[in-house]
Amino acid sequence: MNTNSNTYTVIYSIILVVIVAAVLAFSAMFLKPMQDANVKKDTIGQILTAATVEGEDILATYQQEIEKAILVNIKGEEVGTLNVEECEVYGNSDLKRQIAAEEKALPVYIFKNGITVVPCYGAGLWGPIWGYVGFEGDLKTIKAVRFGHKGETPGLGAKIADEPSFAEAFTGKTVGEGEILFEVAKPANRQTETNGVDAFSGATITSQALGKTLDQWFGFYQNYFAKNGITAEEVVDAVIDETGELEPVTEVEPANTVEE
């Protein structure tokens, strides 16, 4: 065949394109299991942060420290479980499907330290945003959070994931019981002090999107929270059951005074 002909050039180009496409397809198939494993590891790391659990080996730490991982419906009823030994967790695609699903199966991660972690997922300014919220035993008081995003503006909306002080602001805040369960807004626009945190200056849209996402997902879990949250009285009862008696409060004697 004449290597200078147009026919040769076309055939050569087609063969080259087919070879490159085959190599790319093979590489994608070969690398996908490793990519999926990395995504799962990152997801579990975020869950552990919300649960205030630390460990060098993320997967091993998760297996050791989690008590159980369940799925609940909108009524707060348990409808399934996640395999803890295999570190089975819901990824972002799984969470996205639950938003529009008529029969929801929402993940709940319950840890041995008493922290319960639930996820959230929604739309930010430039792409998806997500997060994990760790609750105290009352399932109202937030212990810790970890947020992530795909394309928010660096230095502005991206601060939901990058700014430690923003995450720290959630600690001690509670989920409300009214029409709005939680807000991320400027102080002047917030309805309550305890059921929300301040929005970032210059990142109003991302802040509002995160607030709406949290409010929506807390609504999904509202019945579960109401049915499973531990009250202060139940905490006292649990202490009595464990010790067999409630220790009396020891009176503190006043300090000696100096007589003139």
How would you name each of these model-derived features?
Residues 2-260:
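Flexible, solvent-exposed loop/hinge segments and secondary-structure transition points
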